[in-house]
Each structure stands twice: as structure tokens, then as C-alpha cells.
Amino acid sequence: AGSMDSCSETGVCMKACSERIRQVENDNKCPAGECICTT
């Protein structure tokens, strides 16, 4: 398992999130190219 698609905590912006844990509607709160974690 790669650490790139795991989230350390909810609401954290990451460079790479797996589709099942990202919250697309909140990606705009993150820097460009990053996604927000929801788990």
C-alpha cells in the first residue's frame, strides 16, 4: 500500500488522494493541484 493515497487527518490538503477519500467539492480550498482528505 502506498502512503500517497492515505490521509493523516480529515481536511488536510495532499498532492495525491485516492478517489474514494477525496472530497472534490472542497478541492478549491487547497492549493492548485492538491485535493482534500475526508477520512
Swiss-Prot record:
Alphabetic keyword roster: Disulfide bond, Ion channel impairing toxin, Potassium channel impairing toxin, Secreted, Toxin, Voltage-gated potassium channel impairing toxin
GO cellular component, one term: extracellular region
Note: Negative results: does not inhibit rKv1.4/KCNA4 and the sodium channel rNav1.4/SCN4A.
Record-level Gene Ontology MF annotations: potassium channel regulator activity; toxin activity
Disulfide bond residue pairs: C7-C30, C13-C35, C17-C37
Source organism: Buthus occitanus tunetanus (Common European scorpion)
Site (Basic residue of the functional dyad): K29
Entry's free-text remark on domains: Has the structural arrangement of an alpha-helix connected to antiparallel beta-sheets by disulfide bonds (CS-alpha/beta).
Family per record: Belongs to the short scorpion toxin superfamily. Potassium channel inhibitor family. Alpha-KTx 31 subfamily.
Residues spanning the membrane: none
Function noted in UniProt: Voltage-gated potassium channel inhibitor. 1 uM of the native toxin inhibits rat Kv1.2/KCNA2 (100% inhibition), and drosophila Shaker IR/Sh (100%), human Kv1.3/KCNA3 (83%), rat Kv1.1/KCNA1 (32%) and rat Kv1.6/KCNA6 (21%).
The name this protein goes by in its record: Potassium channel toxin alpha-KTx 31.1
Cellular localisation: Secreted
Tissue: Expressed by the venom gland.
